[in-house]
């Protein structure tokens, strides 16, 4: 069976540029933050966002334990406020929507309203040949609603400026899926 996490990184890898700027808009336990930190290298910059202190602490501990390059800024704030922190064009941006894995609190999730703002702003900030990956988890109510909202929103972007793709296991409607947005 296809591993969606591996597939996501296969799409992102050709867009990575040493010394560029990347963002993990939903830091969670720091998996993507760590991967981006290593990929961007010592001269790159990685911004990571989460609204939960637990996510920030877990990510910081992981980055330190894994001896990640000191190229990251961990931000305890909503990804919808990304423009307050990121001033440079983005090479790569990653969203893993939903709730904090392992927290046991499935009631605290990303929300359509803030996700819409964050995704719109992140797309606007993409550098030429930049890429944005958005993983959606429709197995819970808000995740399904976020997926519908993103389908509608992303389908309206000009094909002359962006390539927007969706990857989904079509015979498993509650399985995670993801969008890839590439700026031309």
State where each predicted segment sits:
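S-adenosyl-L-methionine
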Residues: 1-20, 34, 38, 56-89
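Helix-to-beta-strand junctions that scaffold the AdoMet/dcAdoMet cofactor pocket
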Residues: 17, 40-41, 126-128
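A short acidic, Gly/Pro-enriched loop at the edge of an enzyme's catalytic core
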Residues: 17-20, 84-94
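Conserved beta-strand signature within the Rossmann-like core of class I S-adenosyl-L-methionine
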Residues: 26, 118, 125-136
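Conserved SAM-binding motif I beta-strand of class I
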Residues: 45-50
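Mobile active-site "lid"/loop adjacent to the S-adenosyl-L-methionine
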Residues: 95-118
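Class I S-adenosyl-L-methionine
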Residues: 140-184
């Amino acid at each position: 069976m296809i591993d969606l996490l591996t597939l996501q990184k296969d799409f992102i890898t050709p867009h990575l540029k040493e010394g560029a700027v990347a963002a993990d808009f939903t830091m969670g336990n720091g998996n993507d933050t760590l991967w981006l930190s290593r990929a961007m290298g010592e001269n790159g910059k990685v911004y990571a966002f989460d609204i939960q202190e637990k996510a920030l602490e877990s990510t910081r501990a992981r980055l330190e334990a894994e001896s990640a390059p000191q190229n990251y800024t961990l931000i305890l704030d909503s990804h919808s406020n990304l423009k307050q922190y990121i001033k440079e064009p983005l090479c790569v941006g990653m969203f893993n929507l939903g709730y904090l894995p392992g927290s046991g609190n499935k009631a605290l999730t990303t929300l359509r309203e803030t996700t819409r703002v964050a995704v719109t702003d992140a797309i606007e900030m993409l550098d030429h040949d930049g890429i944005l990956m958005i993983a959606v988890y429709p197995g819970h109510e808000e995740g399904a609603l976020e997926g519908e909202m993103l389908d509608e929103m992303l389908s309206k972007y000009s094909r002359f400026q962006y390539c927007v793709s969706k990857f989904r296991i079509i015979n498993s409607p509650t399985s995670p899926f993801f969008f890839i947005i590439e700026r031309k």
